[in-house]
């Protein structure tokens, strides 16, 4: 089974948010998009693991600011109590489970069923709200007494001490028992893990101790206690130890009559005390002596192995930014390990990964990718797998730049990319916010389709397509349709066959190009033929001439490129 949907209300940045998940989901988005908040929200209705602890009682800073503002505004405006109560800032996290695979999983979630059994929908919810709505509203009114402007209020003054939480079944409101909830665990490998094994009192010791204690069978614990007793016997047999507890020979009779024979026996400590003295070594060095990236790799490996091995009905493993501090090779190893582990994890393992790395994204099926944008969770679709296959052929293609950059220009090849980057650098405008990406092919339809899934109708996001005509009107019309139907897409095609033809034909460029290459071409067609003979090398020379600040008459851009760049201003 797995968690299919999560609904969040009034938790941190989420005013009203819903996301659909799969057994393996990769979540991407810009900074502050809410990836960490999503993982934290999931921990509220679910059981924490043995390694980390997630508090379920929230603070006022965890409540959505907009919800608090709306509540305050209703009081200031003198709304009726019923309307004010409806606006009380309440945090709700509702989780839907589906697809139980065996009687154990059905036994755990069966009582949470919603609607018809055929739908296989089982829900529980976490609520953080005032215990007494009337008393809460009265307290809030007293707090805002005399205030007439919302700007005079303070969100952190909300009487949070009147709140309480509970985890209930969505179908009948009954509390979820701990015995059921303990079989559904959320396990988080968060992004802030730099202190793992950073010194000789490292966090790795604590984690390893907890892992061992929770995993040891009773028979193993008995063996450890027995071994500890044997270890103590060896200590007791040392000469120094004997001297401490053996009386002076001159007083043997005194001790025989008054004091029983003194012996030392082990004060058997609990397992935590014994196991906490174990530390990790890698090669010939302590783990804390290894590099930060290596420690992060070990951290992910240890925890993910431990989490997926838990004998629960569901293990939800959340991994934040697995790429943190990892080299190219180690990141490849980590992504392979996570991906293959999820494939073999069975129905009890569900994995959520957040990432900023194209290498992690390209490793997985595109249909597993979810883009967080505002209060939306957008699932990428690739029905014909055109983009998935493209990413498999170009594993280093940065799809994040395509999807998340505010201004993106897609071009066919490196020649256009060199030319445009040179112009941008010379003009020094839009350079920091404009991404120029070469797709190394002629068709842009697939890229525009996936870009629109995330950015359709968003005026702050712009995409320009710069393409060659190639004497193909049908293909030109297919691309131009996207320009016509979308205000934030601009498609521009060469007038003639390719870029070189249009560049040579641009007013004044024939003279400029003849001067640059020391040629005497009489027509643009003749110059275009020359440029095509060694495209990359000659475009590089053109780009260098544009970058030369001493050149007061640089090559001019052709009309289709200039219009595509003007659209970005």
Explain the meaning of each model-derived region.
Residues 19, 83-88, 117-119, 179-182, ...:
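Conserved catalytic network of the ASCE P-loop NTPase/AAA+ motor domain
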Residues 57-211, 218-223, 485:
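Glycine-rich phosphate-binding loops of NTPases
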Residues 1-26, 30, 42-85, 92-100:
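Extreme N-terminal "head/tail" segments of very large remodeling/mechanoenzyme assemblies
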Residues 97, 128, 190-193, 282, ...:
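Flexible glycine-/small-residue-rich
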Residues 1-47, 273-275, 279-401, 478, ...:
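Switch/communication elements of ASCE P-loop NTPase nucleotide-binding domains
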Residues 103-106, 136, 197-200, 289-290, ...:
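Short helix/loop capping segments that flank catalytic or ligand/cofactor-binding pockets
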Residues 195-316:
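Extended helical coiled-coil dimerization/tether regions that scaffold
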Residues 361-569:
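Acidic, divalent-metal-binding catalytic cores of TOPRIM
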